Every structure is written in C-alpha cells, then in structure tokens.
Amino acid sequence: MNIQALLSEKVSQAMIAAGAPADCEPQVRQSAKVQFGDYQANGMMAVAKKLGMAPRQLAEQVLTHLDLSGIASKVEIAGPGFINIFLEPAFLAEQVQQALASDRLGVSQPTRQTIVVDYSAPNVAKEMHVGHLRSTIIGDAAVRTLEFLGHHVIRANHVGDWGTQFGMLIAWLEKQQQENAGDMALADLEGFYRDAKKHYDEDEAFAERARNYVVKLQSGDTYFREMWRKLVDITMTQNQITYDRLNVTLTRDDVMGESLYNPMLPGIVADLKAKGLAVESEGATVVFLDEFKNKEGDPMGVIIQKKDGGYLYTTTDIACAKYRYETLHADRVLYYIDSRQHQHLMQAWTIVRKAGYVPDSVPLEHHMFGMMLGKDGKPFKTRAGGTVKLADLLDEALERARRLVAEKNPDMPADELEKLANAVGIGAVKYADLSKNRTTDYIFDWDNMLAFEGNTAPYMQYAYTRVLSVFRKANIDEQALASAPVIISEDREAQLAARLLQFEETLTVVAREGTPHVMCAYLYDVAGLFSGFYEHCPILSAENDAVRNSRLKLAQLTAKTLKLGLDTLGIETVERM
C-alpha cells in the first residue's frame, strides 16, 4: 500500500471541500522529524495565497473536512499552516499484517507500461572499462525496479557496433590470417585494436584497403558481414562474463547496436528534407534549431548527413527514438548516458518531436550521471594513468573482500568464503555507486566501500543476516506466527513499522526519477531503525508470547524488505557473515 498516496487523496478531498480548486496539490510528504508526525501536508501555503486567506486559517478549515478515522491517531496544525499526521498504531499493525501476507509485501501495481531502458552501451572490439560501470548498474537497478512494479521493460544495450573502424579491424584480422576469430580473447582484441590502428596510421596501402573494406561492409557484402559479426560476437561473449559477475540482467538478446538503425537513415534524411526541417548547407544536410544557439546567437546547425554521404550519431539517435516508439511501442524511454551527452541528446530529440516521430505524450528521459573519480578528485585511472578495465576492478574487489572475510572468519570453508567474498566484493562496488545521487560525481574509495559501518553494502548485508539470526535463535512455530496478531504499543515499534510501510513509496520514487540512491537511503534507515528497535524492544525475551510474536513479525517484515530492496538494486544477500 502507498500510504502517502492514500493521505494525499484524503487531504486533497478535504482541501476541495474547504474551497480549494479541484487541481490543488496537498503536498503530502514523509515527515523529516518524529515530532512532526509520520507525514506532513505542506500544500496550504500555495493554495491559501490563491484564495487570499492565511494558510493557517485554510488548514483549520481543511481539518474540519478531513476524515482520517482508522488511519491517524492525531492530526495537528503546526507553524504557518503545516498539517502533521500521526498514524494510528492499529492501522500500522493491520498494514504490517497485509504486507507479510503478500509476496510483494503489499506493493500495488501501477498501470502497466512498455518502458525501454537504454543502458551499458559498450563498444565492439574494446574491453569494458570503469566508465561503463555507472550506466550498467544504475540502468539495471531501474530495470529491476520497473519490472518488480509490473511494467513491461525492454532492455536496450546500444552497443557501438558500426563505423569506419571496422574496415581497419577486418583488414588487420585478414592480414594476421586469424580466420578463426572466435578463439580470440578480448584481452588479445584490445592489443589487436591498437595494432590495427597503428598500421592504419602508418601504412597508407593498409589504410586504403581498410577504407575499401568499409564500403564493402556497408554495402552488405556477405564475407565482410561475417567478419564483422565475428568481432561483435567475441566482444559480447566477453562482456557477458562481466555482466554475469556484476549480477546485471543484460543478455545477448538485449543488444540493439547502432547497426540496427542503418537501414532507416537514408529514409529519415529524405523525410526531414521533405518536411522542410533539413536543408543543404555547404554540401552537408543540416537541421537548424532555434532552441539551441551558436556563439553568434544564431540557430545552431545540427548535421545529419556529411558531404561524403556519411551519417552521424545524431542521425542514428533520431532513428533510434523513432524505432523505440513505432516498433517497440514504448510508452516511456529512459536513457542512462553520462551528462556530457546531454546537449547532443536534446538536439536529436528536438528534431524527433518536430518531425512527429515520437508524440509529446511519450517521455524521452535522459537520466544522466556524473563521473567516478579517484581520491585525488580526478577521473579514476590506473597508477600509470591508463583506463581501468572493469574486469580488473572486479578482480581487485574480490581479492580485497576475500582478505576481509577470511580475517573475520578464519575457519570458514574455502567454497563458502569464495561465495561470501563475491557477494561482499561485487556488492560493495555496486552499492558505493548506487548509494550516491547519480547526477553527481563521486570518489571511488576502497576503504569506505568495504567498511562494515555506514551506508555500505557490507553493512547492509550484515544488517540482513543480523535480522535472520533472531529467527535462528528462536524456536518458532511457523503456523502460530502466521496467525499471530501484530500489536504496536512502543514508539520504536511504530517508527519501524511506519518506515517499513514506506517501501512502495520508495519504489515509486526510484521508478519515476531513476534514482537508486533513494532506495539505498531508505534501506539504511530501515536497518538503523531495526537496530534501535532490537536494542530497546526485547524480542525473544519479551514479556509474553503475544508481544514476542508481534515483534518477530516486525523482524520478519524487516528481513523481507531488506532482501527485496537490495534485490531491486542487484545486490546479493547472504544468510550468514
């Protein structure tokens, strides 16, 4: 259940009854402090101004129409006109029971949409590096959340699988007589790419052959298409290993590379010309956009076809948006691409809207993100100043976690230690990123991310095992527990219950804004509240069976919420640590 939505509806009805316009916003928010109740309605200020009355006067009138019987134990006006709402313990108890009775913890399903999520997008013939981490894991957390809510999610891995470099790579592959390219490892392919580029730059005859191969590849020649396909296959096979290690849900079936849109490009250029949106300018085809200005203050020209007939990324992105609406029938499209691409995307989408390829009713959303920085505040690099390979980063995470786990559990069997180290190490890397607001840069710090205190994966994983340990110590009659009532009489019980029941609200924010850090903050808060509850409200040594069972049920909902919440982030939980 979404309590915030329920209260918003009730307060809105009371505001309208008190004379507010039908489209008034009650602005019901989770209260920042316990003394302000569980929720606070802050909408009186804006509405009172429109009505020409004092906010507190409006709040008083709203209260005469506000019926929260069975939901709130107390409703009071604070300050200039805030309405503080304190939830009824019996209501909390009933909602906890309902959440426990449902596999979905009582989370309702919104109207089902088809949502395309564009994320990860590595390049062919290159190994994934740390620059791919944020898009891959933030996008995957959004996908998991949207799918849990019941949406039809289409993962779109916009792989860089096309371009002039493929002539060079195929020519080098041929020169090396490596017809059995499938046996090449991607680490070899990294060097292979560098060698091909070196020859391309230094050997004019080789470069000429490479340019001819591009033409043959683009014209659909079977032999060259097959060679190109080998390069794509090698790359994606290696990338899949990384995706699996990261516990990311992408598969080969989700690849929708740049090459997919090639057949659409000539038709799009012709159509934009026919619609009067694109014009010839100095031999190129250009769309001038009033919405963007150049340095002189004139409409910015966006090239969609070069003088030599070649197309640009913008042309591909126009085709891509069109395809996602017309062919995939998207109701909403999310792009997890770094912030440096923002203007480029905005220009492509402006053309898309002007051409009528995607209606305004279908949101195209750039969920941009900042950079991963080293401790020096500069882009994260190797000691030698090179790009950090993602596989190397994950290897180091595993090694550090292995040492950490072995130190705390010297007698743990090797296979168990490896499994736990993997969950902790990979979880730490992912959670350190996901727990930061995606729009900002963040400092990558091994010591912080592997710490067992603070908002980290090891702390959250430990918090989960700590709740489970209560059940291991208790001799529980499952049937008796299932039918036992929840009784909320202590403040710490009420605070924990109220926060647990805000799981759906948290999921809704993550789904709407694409901000997994909101879920991380919520789960960290739940873990902290459980810790206080556990300390001050004895569970196994409670004064009687009724209180014991009730508190066990609160612990049960805590464990389920932590597990499900971490699962939406792609963070593995463990039974023991």
From Swiss-Prot:
Gene3D superfamilies per record: Arginyl tRNA synthetase N-terminal domain, HUPs, Isoleucyl-tRNA Synthetase, Domain 1
Matching SUPFAM superfamilies: Anticodon-binding domain of a subclass of class I aminoacyl-tRNA synthetases, Arginyl-tRNA synthetase (ArgRS), N-terminal 'additional' domain, Nucleotidylyl transferase
Motif ('HIGH' region): 122-132
Catalytic activity: tRNA(Arg) + L-arginine + ATP = L-arginyl-tRNA(Arg) + AMP + diphosphate
Keywords of the record: Aminoacyl-tRNA synthetase, ATP-binding, Cytoplasm, Ligase, Nucleotide-binding, Protein biosynthesis
EC category: ligase
Annotated EC: 6.1.1.19
Keyword field contains Ligase: yes
GO biological process: arginyl-tRNA aminoacylation
Localization (cell): Cytoplasm
Main subcellular localisation: cytoplasm
One cellular component term from this protein's GO annotations in UniProt: cytoplasm
InterPro entries reported for this sequence: aa-tRNA-synth_I_CS, Arg-tRNA-ligase, Arg-tRNA-synth_N, Arg-tRNA-synth_N_sf, ArgRS_core, DALR_anticod-bd, Rossmann-like_a/b/a_fold, tRNAsynth_Ia_anticodon-bd
UniProt keyword Ligase present: yes
GO molecular function annotation: arginine-tRNA ligase activity; ATP binding
Family, similarity comment: Belongs to the class-I aminoacyl-tRNA synthetase family.
Quaternary structure, from the entry: Monomer.
Name this polypeptide is given: Arginine--tRNA ligase
UniProt organism field: Salmonella typhimurium (strain LT2 / SGSC1412 / ATCC 700720)
Taxonomic path: Bacteria, Pseudomonadati, Pseudomonadota, Gammaproteobacteria, Enterobacterales
